[in-house]
Amino acid sequence: MKTNNNICDVCRRREAFFSRPYSGEKLCRKCFAESIEGKVRTTIAKYQMLNFDDKIAVAVSGGKDSVSLLHILAKIEQNYPKASFVAVTVDEGIKGYRDEALEIAAENCEKLGVKHHVVSFKKLYGFTLDKIVKSLKQKGEDELTPCAYCGVLRRKALNMAARKVKADKLATAHTLDDETQTILLNIFHGDALRIAREKPITDEVHPKLVQRIKPFCEVPEKETALYAYIRKIKFQSVPCPYAAEALRNDIRVMLNRIEEKHAGTKFTIFKSIEKVRPALEAMAKKEGLRECSECGEPTTEKICKTCQMLRQIR
């Protein structure tokens, strides 16, 4: 008797739609989507990311990762009547790119009945990212890429937005790919001890810092895209025009090439770091936080990195 080898390994009824190279699992559309939702629930429980009555701010850019996380957290939140969540979006001011993302983020929030808050670089800092890039080029200052400036400014903007809405947690859609890229990026920059701070859930070290959680930290980026496709979630597919200039992009390409040949490499990197993280934390000096003398936000220096960058731009 001939057996059908293309049947879902979970339900044993429906035709398989996707095969996970790192585990060998074959899954139908329904079981695949449920496996992603289950993985998020497991990750939240594993790292004790949430309390039953938390107010969560979800960072929503409009891309596949953030809108997928928004939909999954909305589903989970239904089981916790005392919990609540809002979406926060940062408008960096990237012409021809961010406008579409803002519309998509707003559309997803409206569909889910989630309040949507938007903060902009222009309003917070007086500059759009486009203006920053133009200003730096005119000055001949190209030591840092646009992504380096955007990363620092965006991180501060998200924290301020989450604090403004009185959130207990700030959920970001960093995937397994993002986490492994960051690990290698820190090593390439000679800052291996920084890995100790880049955890799935951050330590609360200052009253002005909203604790960050990463429910997608063990989900590959490819699978968040597939989840959005299966659940028919609208997202922006066009990449940021500045992304190609960053070292992170080179690391992404390298990791994807290795993963293609050696499935499971990204998980191995992530799990290895999780094992040695306690030792790294013991080695890393606990940096005391103070308030920036210019903007009042938490920083390890007298003047925070954002204000240092804005000085350079001005």
Predicted feature residues:
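ATP-dependent adenylation/nucleotidyltransferase module used to activate substrates
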Residues: 1-185, 189-197, 218-231, 304
